Amino acid sequence: MEFPEHGVRLLGRLRQQRELGFLCDCTVLVGDARFPAHRAVLAACSVYFHLFYRDQPASSRDTVRLNGDIVTVPAFSRLLDFMYEGRLDLHNLPVEDVLAAASYLHMYDIVKVCKGRLRKKDPDLETRTLGTELPGQPPHPLPSWSPAFCQAAPKAKHPSLGVKATHPLPTFGPPSWQVAEQSSGALDLSLKPSPRPEQVHPPCRLQTSLCSSVQQVAQPLVKAEQDSFSEQDSSSPQSADRSPPPVCASAAQGLAVDLEPLHIEGTGSQQLGLPAEPVLDSEELGPSRHLCICPLCCKLFPSTHALQLHLSAHFRERDSVRARLSPEGSVPTCPLCSKTFSCTYTLKRHERTHSGEKPYTCVQCGKSFQYSHNLSRHAVVHTREKPHACRWCERRFTQSGDLYRHVRKFHYGLVKPLLV
């Protein structure tokens, strides 16, 4: 026999007990305000209180002090009423304050509701954020994938890129790279691709043209690549026949895309001996995503994660060519500081600290870096994506260092028990 109203009556009686101060066994302090409450209710509704009462000794559980810089008194009062009533009142209260307090207390249902309210309140907020230009970035981002743009695009094929839509549409289901990201354990808030439209629009070709300014920038870039490879032993036939990858325009005007998978032929990963990349599908990209372009070979990717994997393959191949051991009987030694190294490649990396050489250049903004991993991290700046997610409050960050500082500042009390 079930009593559907039992939960409502139980919450009502607990609310009456809190208002009367009856059986309240703890006090929450927010600034100068005091809120008597029941530990069981707080721990049942908030992960923060659950961990606090689980880890704190019994002698220090009577009073809980919250960070007044993050949790305001009105916001916590509304959240406390929600715990006892099951109803959230956002009238005459900034949603941002409730969102900050709910994130601090790890009340994830409230966090999702507040974020949805903010998106409805200002739907163009995300668009304006993406439209803000960063210093040194091209003024026009790559156009997004859309059927209307695809219909209006010219169906010509650029001979230098060799882009052809030759594969059939794949079956339904999430792409493999998304499944790999979801299985990593981090909470993913990135936009998922929208469902496939019922009517597929006619295919069109991908077409770009090289800007003269980019061609001018490409000259020293190609020369730098040739110089870096010429430093190796000329006896190797592979390094002698190797040619640098082409450089394409960063802001491709008149970019037309296909709703079918795209396959890029010609020079690129095949010449470098890199593993074959998965074919891009419109379902993987989604209508609201921008393309990610490899700064070394101009290959297109649907996400920053896929681009970084591709860049790591680039650098592994380049490092394997450069990291040949020196001839027998000689130890690689720096001529400036006499420091010795295990192989020639590590010596060349060390020499950059003396010369200031920056061989890794981003073709989108022209910024150069001394090491390959710095260029890989920099590529995220142009895509505006935030792949690093906080597992406790759902905030996302562009760089892993920003996530680390956020966790140390706001969630150190939660991380410390996990490290013991």
Curated annotation (Swiss-Prot):
Keywords: Cytoplasm, DNA-binding, Metal-binding, Nucleus, Repeat, Repressor, Transcription, Transcription regulation, Zinc, Zinc-finger. Residues 24-92 form the BTB domain. InterPro entries: BTB/POZ_dom, SKP1/BTB/POZ_sf, Znf_C2H2_sf, Znf_C2H2_type. It is found in: Cytoplasm; Nucleus, Nucleoplasm. It holds the Pfam family zf-C2H2_4. One of its GO terms (biological process) is negative regulation of transcription by RNA polymerase II. Residues 127-204, 222-247 are annotated as: Disordered. Residues 227-241 have a biased composition (Low complexity). The keyword S-adenosyl-L-methionine does not apply. Transcriptional repressor. Specifically binds DNA and probably acts by recruiting chromatin remodeling multiprotein complexes. This is Zinc finger and BTB domain-containing protein 42. It comes from Mus musculus.
